[in-house]
Regions:
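Residue-level detector of conserved catalytic or cofactor/ligand-binding positions
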Residues: 546-554
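Short, small/polar-rich motifs associated with maturation and membrane association
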Residues: 1-293, 298-300, 305-307, 313, ...
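Structured alpha-helical segments in the cores of large, soluble enzyme domains
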Residues: 256-262, 511-521
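Repeated loop/turn-to-beta-strand initiation elements of outer-membrane beta-barrel proteins
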Residues: 266-269, 303-306, 388-391, 459, ...
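Residue-level signature of outer-membrane beta-barrel architecture
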Residues: 157-159, 262-264, 275, 298, ...
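Exposed, low-structure sequence patches enriched in small/polar residues
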Residues: 394, 466, 516-520, 530
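Surface-exposed loop/interface segments of Gram-negative outer-membrane beta-barrel transport/assembly proteins
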Residues: 32, 90, 162-239, 280-376, ...
Length: 554
């Protein structure tokens, strides 16, 4: 027989024929009782939590399965956390996270805090993450104010140990393919008949496709390798294309990470570097990411701790945009052959809809790159005045640069059945080139006073008082030109005619005061109160402060 209870060590008891009255005593599970959970601006014992906080051991997740992004990997790991992806394009993390549903008509995404500072899940190498906490209710989120109205996700990255130096390498090669292919109608004659039926069902008097084309396709499909009057194979002149098969293919993901960690009584450190190459499942959508992290903490004296948490990354993406795959597939038609003899196919049937086209042709008409550069560093110090009282000072600097450069590529479309070029090669004078450049930087100054003491072994008291200043500057410019001298000279300066130009800039600042008081009697009776006072430069100077508090919770 097995006896278990939350907070106690499970006990196995052997039952025999001579067993009568049983007296079972369970021992407290000290590891569980002492387990701490990351909360806003600190940690708390799990048994003393008053709010709804879930903790995910993310390091274990990375050991059991390939993970390309942190946000997509959170799906199914915590009750109340919903994760849905709007795009599977490599490097484009469109995963939408919702904590306990949608809480507002505007931005409903949770606030993301990485190592104590606001950040983006895109900026984290999954193998650098140690633990993730999800704050779900008002009690746990109030310390962050109005920004936390939709929940908070707290990410804690790995740190070094005080043991000897260790070197770890993790390498993985995986294969990526669509889990469920969209079933496309590849028999074009059947497609034409169904389209005619749909027209009749909505009361239209005329069919979309003439019966002679339906009969022609059925006849030519019986001999796909035969030649038409222009010497073109029937399977090209009268195609039955499955566009799901043409557009999607298997891709390879290379993921390599190297870390060095260790330390002594005075210092501990973790240095890591990562490389990921994701080919994608659609042409012209590949993505490469390079990242590095340095987490260093030193104790020059017993009362002083200093250190840094620094992260940098660069992500390069191809410019193929397949984020809305359904629209691409809706515009396709089985009566178009994808590519032959250096040209992209065009719908062969004269009765085909004007919106029908060749998705490969659309993907191939642009080339270039998208580049995302991130740099984030936090310098921190901790001074212990007494065993129970400490002061934390944190300074964070964050820099983000996004750059896109695109240019037109000569390509043309041919109706293969008769060799007519429908959309000719664009001359260099009409080819366009463009760039987008976005840059923002921010800094955060933070001061925290922490107090924690246990009286008479049963009265656990802790308090936090904090002050924070935040400033952010944003700048964007974009422009497009056409008229290249030669298609191989596709830099922006090489074009002759400006077609568009624009830009914008913005900056704002916030100032915040916040605090928290916790009391626990014998880890059974709990009390917590939070407050926050925020000021923003976006409001009028007389209305720039707002007060947010969370009622006391026994």
């Amino acid at each position: 027989m097995q006896v278990s209870y939350i907070g106690y060590v499970t006990k196995d008891i052997k039952i025999t024929s001579t067993t009568n009255n049983l007296s079972i005593k369970l021992a407290e599970d000290t590891e569980t009782l002492d387990e701490v959970v990351v909360v806003g601006y600190g940690v708390q014992k799990k048994v003393n939590l008053t709010g709804a906080v879930a903790s995910v051991d993310f390091e274990e997740q990375t050991k059991s399965r390939p993970i390309t992004t942190v946000s997509s990997a959170l799906a199914g790991l915590s009750p109340g956390l919903q994760a849905s992806s709007g795009s599977a394009m490599p490097g484009e993390d469109n995963t939408t996270l919702r904590v306990r549903g949608v809480g507002t008509m505007n931005t409903a995404s949770p606030l993301v805090i990485i190592d104590g500072m606001e950040g983006s899940l895109n900026a984290v190498n999954p193998l650098d993450v140690e633990n993730i906490s999800i704050l779900k209710d008002a009690a746990s989120c109030a310390i962050y104010g109005a920004r936390a109205a939709n929940g908070v996700i707290l990410v804690t990255t790995k740190t070094g140990t005080r043991d000897k130096i260790s070197i770890n390498y993790s390498g993985r090669i995986s294969f990526n393919s669509p889990t469920r292919m969209i079933k496309m109608m590849s028999n074009y004659a059947d497609y034409m008949e169904l389209m005619n039926e749909s027209y009749r069902n909505v009361g239209k008097s005329d069919d979309l496709f003439d019966q002679k084309y339906i009969d022609l396709w059925r006849e030519k499909s019986k001999d796909p390798n035969g030649l038409n009057e222009n010497g073109v194979p029937n399977y090209i002149a009268y195609p039955n294309t499955d566009w799901a098969e043409e557009l999607f293919s298997g891709g390879v993901i290379h993921d390599h990470n190297l870390s060095v960690s260790g330390g002594s009584d005075k210092i501990r450190f973790l240095l890591s570097a990562g490389y990921q190459d994701n080919e994608g499942v659609v042409d012209n959508t590949a993505n490469k990411r390079y990242s590095m992290r340095a987490n260093i903490e030193a104790n020059p004296t017993k009362w002083l701790t200093v250190g840094t948490r620094t992260y940098a990354s660069q992500m390069d993406r191809e410019v193929g945009d397949f984020s809305n795959a359904n629209n691409f597939l809706r515009q396709s038609t089985a009566g178009t052959y994808p590519y032959w003899n250096g040209s992209y196919g065009y719908p062969e049937c004269p009765d085909e809809r004007a919106t029908a086209n060749n998705p490969l042709y659309k993907l191939a008409r642009n080339d270039g790159f998208k580049r995302y550069n991130r740099f984030n560093t936090t310098l921190f110090s901790k001074i212990k005045f007494f065993e129970d009282l400490s002061w934390d000072f944190n300074f964070n600097y964050n820099r983000y640069i996004y750059e896109t450069r695109q240019h037109g590529v000569p390509a043309y479309q041919t109706r293969f059945s008769d060799g007519v070029i429908v959309d000719g090669i664009t001359p260099p004078s009409q080819l366009s080139t463009s760039f987008d450049y976005e840059s923002n930087y921010s800094y955060t100054l933070e001061n925290l006073i922490n107090y924690h003491h246990t009286f008479a072994q049963k009265h656990d008291v802790s308090a936090l008082l904090g002050y924070q200043e935040f400033y952010k500057n944003y700048y964007k410019v974009n422009a497009a030109k056409k008229g290249l001298i030669d298609e191989s000279l596709n830099q922006f300066d090489e074009a002759t005619e400006m077609t568009s130009i624009g830009g914008s800039t913005e900056d704002y600042a916030t100032r915040s005061y916040f605090g928290r008081v916790n009391y626990a009697y014998d880890s059974r009776y709990l009390f917590e109160a939070n407050f926050r006072y925020d000021g923003s430069s976006r409001f009028h100077k007389d209305l720039s402060l707002i007060h947010i508090s969370e009622p006391t919770r026994p």
